[in-house]
């Protein structure tokens, strides 16, 4: 991606990329993507270089966050339901949204904008035809231009596309002209930049999703809190702890201590310098006059299992206070790691914090859907209502398992709540019946504590 051209063009428009924010986002992204950082490069006592293992705890933590904000249904109302379902499927929204959830947890911010592909631009600045598409943007390709009460009303987005094997960098700038949006698209290819300006309407053509946790890092206005960046010391020490543990296991074979005088000689009886391989296999004790102890002897190291277990558990406990939702989220007990998605099923108090993030996700999806409907009405001649409520349903399977759900139905049925409908619902879930069968069972059979099959 030609970031220099993007930077130069934005500067010509009076916009400056926030280098401080981008450096933090990039560092968080490196840990999320399991890139080898400078902190992973080490030297042993013999000055042999080695690298700490990259355990991917940052990726795991971000994925765990994403699990709790998965969406299973978007309902924009009866009239637009089929259109939105097909549109989201064509734009791979489910897969891209999942990817964005992880990136948001790691880097703090993701975005999406609506555009027309292969459209025709008329002299009056309006466009006709084309396909409505979604463009998904990472934090490294996002610049908030105008922020009002933490609401981003104007922004720039950039990224790389490939057309017929050729890479192009696309910059899109959304600004307001009165109450209506103006979109400027700049394509940087092999030749001169190609710029196109079109006039849109009052509906915001983009949406930004940020970490719901307050961003306490000064100088990152408009960007969400990058949770991975805030926890880099913990992720590093987890890598270091596992690296030392793996080293213990690797070196649990016998170590041979050998005197420098026990070396190979060449044909002229000159000592051959020690190879790197020999330095890995032996520990040399110098060339001093050897005794029986220093000439050569072996030792069998122990694997410090209990010490590593306690260290890793402590690090995960600290991580629990800083990452995820609620309070205690991770533990390492009896050789097993309990993750946040497992823990949330036991602690409903975590829902309070989780719902804040779900509200952010709900607003993000709401903004995308309304923009898509406006584009469809304006450029495709449809007449979908833009003011209807858009319902977003999240996947709660991590929070309430099937057994708990059935028990709730059972208790409601026994108490008479909901009458025949609740009884049928319980039987349908319990015995995997269809609606008609469940209704007949509920009507024909008695429903008491001894006959409910539980």
Where are these regions (language model features)?
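Extended, helix-rich architectural segments
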Residues: 1-137, 452-454
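Extended, regular secondary-structure scaffolds
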Residues: 111-225
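Extended, charged amphipathic alpha-helical segments
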Residues: 196-345, 393-394, 401
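Short, basic interhelical loop/turn and adjoining N-cap
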Residues: 431-438
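Extended, non-catalytic structural segments that build the interaction scaffolds
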Residues: 25-29, 33-52, 287-322, 338-363, ...
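Extended, compositionally biased alpha-helical segments that mediate assembly or anchoring
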Residues: 440-454
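Short acidic alpha-helical/loop segments enriched in Asp/Glu that coordinate divalent cations
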Residues: 324-338, 367-388
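Short amphipathic alpha-helical segments
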Residues: 79-80, 88-96, 104, 230, ...
